[in-house]
A protein has these predicted regions:
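Short coil-to-helix leader/linker segments, especially the first N-terminal amphipathic alpha-helix
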Residues: 1-19
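Outer membrane beta-barrel
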Residues: 17-173
């Protein structure tokens, strides 16, 4: 019996994707996607015709998982639509590609391409949970959104209701 034959579908929940797991819980693999489309119809003054267009704004596929009791995790996320904002600018197809290690509870070391903790608060919200379809123009123009580098993130509870979440980031600066 091979190990591949023992992989089971652990769970499926709409919005969370499908999760495959080892029977002993040693590793998990999650596959999920996100699709956002736009259809516009316009009629200009002095013109009797309607102009329409259909756009695939976001078409994202994400593969993530963990192993060794959650000590090691990874994420690979792509955007096949390559649309950035509402102005048709092209962005990179690869959004996230990183591996993370948790040596102790509350501390995570990551290496690769991922979102940075140094951007404004709006960029900490994922695209599929925004209140409006687009981010603000300020965030689109001035946010770095994702960087390649080494990330050290902490999360330490202080008292009953507060957390201290320090971050240290060394990136390529693009």
């Amino acid at each position: 019996d091979s190990d591949a034959a023992k992989i089971i579908v652990n769970k499926y929940r709409l919005g969370d994707g499908i999760t495959f797991s080892a029977p002993d819980g040693g590793y998990n693999i999650n596959l999920r996607g996100f699709l956002q489309t736009t259809f516009e119809t316009r009629k200009y003054e002095g013109d009797d015709q309607f102009y329409s267009r259909f756009r695939m704004r976001r078409l994202r596929l994400r593969l993530s998982g963990d192993a060794w009791g959650g000590k090691v995790s990874y994420r690979l996320q792509t955007d096949f639509a390559q649309a950035n904002g509402g102005d048709g600018e092209l962005s990179g197809m690869l959004l996230d590609a990183f591996i993370a290690y948790k040596p102790v509870k509350g501390l995570t070391l990551s290496f690769g391409q991922k979102s940075t903790p140094t951007d404004n608060r709006e960029l900490g919200i994922t695209s599929n949970t925004l209140q409006l379809v687009d981010r603000s123009k300020l965030s689109s123009y001035f946010g770095s959104i994702r960087e390649v580098g080494l990330f050290v993130d902490g999360s330490f509870r202080i008292g009953h209701t507060a957390y201290l979440r320090p971050s240290i980031v060394i990136t390529d600066g693009d």
